[in-house]
Each structure stands twice: as C-alpha cells, then as structure tokens.
Amino acid sequence: MKETFIHPTALVEQGVELGQGVSVGPFCHIQSGAVIGDNSELMSHVVVTGATTLGTGGKVYPHAVLGCDPQNNKHKGGPTKLNIGANCLIREGVTMHKGSDSARGYTSVGDNCSFLAYAHVAHDCDIGDYVTFSNNVMIGGHTTIGHHAILGGGAAIHQFVRVGHHAFVGGMAAVVSDLIPYGMAIGVHAHLGGLNIVGMKRSGMERKEIHNLRHAVRMLFDRTKPIRDRAKDVLTAIPDSPAVIDMIDFINVDTKRAYCTPPLDAVHGGAGHDSGED
C-alpha cells in the first residue's frame, strides 16, 4: 500500500484520522474530527469539516466543500454528521452539507456514487449506492435518492421528495413529487415520462419484469380510483413480480409528497414515453 502524502501547503488539523495511502493535495483544509478512508485522494483546495467521514477510495476534486453547516434555520448548531461511502467520485465545486439537529442529524451518501461538477447535497439527505448526480444537480433537505438513480444535469429535487431506485431524472427537470422506482421524470415541473428502460436493461433486468412494470404503471396511473386502491389491484393482477412489489411498497409509504404522474394526454394512451425501446 502506498504511503500517506500531505502536501506542505495543506492544513490537516490535530484530531484528523487519515487512513493508509491517503493523498492530500495543495491548499486542502481538513478540520479536526474528520475521517478520511484508505487510498482516498483530495486533489487541491478541498475543504473537509470535522463532521465528515469519507470512505475508502474516494477521489475529491478541487474546491469541493464537504460537511459544512446545513442551510436550515431550525439548526441550532448541535453536533451532526456527513457520512460518505466508499469509492465515491466528487468533482469540482461539489457541496455536501451535514445533517441538522432539528431532524435526523446526519446526511448519508452510499458507496460508488458520482457527483459531477457543482452538484449540491443538502442536509439530512439519504443517498443510496451507485447514484449519479450530473453537473449542477441540486437536491433539497431530507431528500431520499434510491440505489442506481441517475439525475440529469441541472435537475432540482424539492425537499422531502423521494426518488426511487433505478429511476432517471431528466436534465433541467424540477421534481416536486415522489418518483416511483424505475420511473423517468422529465419537464418543469417534472412529470412521469414513462419507465427508465435503459437503466433496467443495464442492470440486467429480465424482459418479463420490464413488461410487468409497464403493465403495473398503466394500472397505477389510469386515474379511475384512488392510487392506493389501484396499488392493491396491481398486486392482485401481478402478484409475483419483485420489481412490481418494490414499486407498490414505495407507493404505500405515507409521506408529505404527491407522486410524479404522467400528463393527462399520456394516461389515455398508457403511461408516457419510456426511455428506451424493448
């Protein structure tokens, strides 16, 4: 394993925990209490506060700022955290805030995530594994992003919104409602534009499951009954599909948000346009 390297111009305060093989580049500032995992690299001009844990194998590009106070007037300055998983790529100018003491108290990022330039993660968010934030993505506080979700450039996610796993948010979309697993949100404000077929195929999902999900979405969003009643009908019609069960479990969680739905004209013809062909 390579030796840990700290550039002479970097400021690493007493009380920082550096793993083996860490590289800290010019003009970085790592504050007391921070934990930097093995083989992580901070290129230059990176700020890591003492509230932050960065997992093994992370790579952080210039001018990223990790673990500063939440932009939340309810936060009173109590001890809170930012936890970032292993093998995360954090590009130039990315900002991630720690949790707030008026809520759960920590912001969490999973493993193998990519945050492209100037993306922002707000306080108390929960981000899964293998998530991609394209340039200038912004997510509000208390947002949940599921595993393998992809957020296109400039997308904005409202606070408390849930984005399901394997979902896709189009570039410049403004999402103010929960987005179902495997769903594709497009537009301002974003609507459900179909299913993320490309993402499902990339994940190795079988053709039968993709067809099950298409059938489920058509039933869920036909607007003839309340959505919870439609969810029961879906499980009756498609009882043995793990992907459909995931989607219905997502629908059945009580939250403060509505759901991304297809435009009215799309509902009459199905459930919008899928992001790919089957």
UniProtKB/Swiss-Prot annotation:
Gene Ontology BP, a term: lipid A biosynthetic process
Functional pathway: Glycolipid biosynthesis; lipid IV(A) biosynthesis; lipid IV(A) from (3R)-3-hydroxytetradecanoyl-[acyl-carrier-protein] and UDP-N-acetyl-alpha-D-glucosamine: step 1/6
One Gene Ontology cellular component: membrane
Signal peptide from the UniProt entry: none
KW Transcription (keyword) present: no
Main subcellular localisation: cytoplasm
PROSITE patterns on file: HEXAPEP_TRANSFERASES
Alphabetized UniProt keyword annotations: Acyltransferase, Cytoplasm, Lipid A biosynthesis, Lipid biosynthesis, Lipid metabolism, Repeat, Transferase
Keyword hit for Transferase: yes
Reactions catalysed according to its record: a (3R)-hydroxyacyl-[ACP] + UDP-N-acetyl-alpha-D-glucosamine = a UDP-3-O-[(3R)-3-hydroxyacyl]-N-acetyl-alpha-D-glucosamine + holo-[ACP]
InterPro entries: Acetyltransf_C, Acetyltransf_C_sf, Hexapep, Hexapep_transf_CS, Lipid_A_LpxA, Trimer_LpxA-like_sf
Spans traversing the lipid bilayer: none
Residue ranges the record marks as coiled coil: none
Free-text function comment from the UniProt entry: Involved in the biosynthesis of lipid A, a phosphorylated glycolipid that anchors the lipopolysaccharide to the outer membrane of the cell.
Record family assignment: Belongs to the transferase hexapeptide repeat family. LpxA subfamily.
Record note on quaternary structure: Homotrimer.
Name of the featured protein: Acyl-[acyl-carrier-protein]--UDP-N-acetylglucosamine O-acyltransferase
